[in-house]
Amino acid sequence: MRTFWIVAMLLVGVEGSLVELGKMILQETGKNPITSYGIYGCNCGVGSRHKPKDGTDRCCFVHKCCYKKLTDCDPKMDGYTYSFKDKTIICDVNNPCLKEMCECDKAVAICLRENLDTYNKKYKIYPKFLCKKPDTC
């Protein structure tokens, strides 16, 4: 179980509800979020924002920027619930900040699906030291 949580920390969003984010990514892309996106490119997983390597990596960059805009909640600590109906993610959360967090996660899951054609296996376990200088949102 401890190994699962260590690996789970490598997910795209590290912050927020890792389980919910992982489920969204799996539902939208059909890919395992940990093995496919956990250490992908320069922006998926742990670390700061860098110049994206491709469309998939850009999704993770935008997701980190989305989390940066959150107010009144902590993406590292707070969680949420959502539903998945008719192949659609529904953020049915009453708390405004948790709803924003859910919407950030929904957006990255959809973005990853829309960028499946940009997914490049050479970026799957990409060394961060090869990433260009940090980029701003």
Curated annotation (Swiss-Prot):
InterPro entries: PLipase_A2, PLipase_A2_Asp_AS, PLipase_A2_dom, PLipase_A2_dom_sf, PLipase_A2_His_AS
UniProt site positions, description: Hydrophobic membrane-disruption site (MDiS): L130
Subunit organization: Homodimer; non-covalently linked.
GO biological process, one term: phospholipid metabolic process
Intracellular or extracellular location(s): Secreted
Gene3D superfamilies documented for this protein: Phospholipase A2 domain
Name of the molecule in the record: Basic phospholipase A2 homolog Cax-K49
Pfam families assigned to the protein according to its UniProt record, in alphabetical order: Phospholip_A2_1
Transmembrane segment boundaries: none
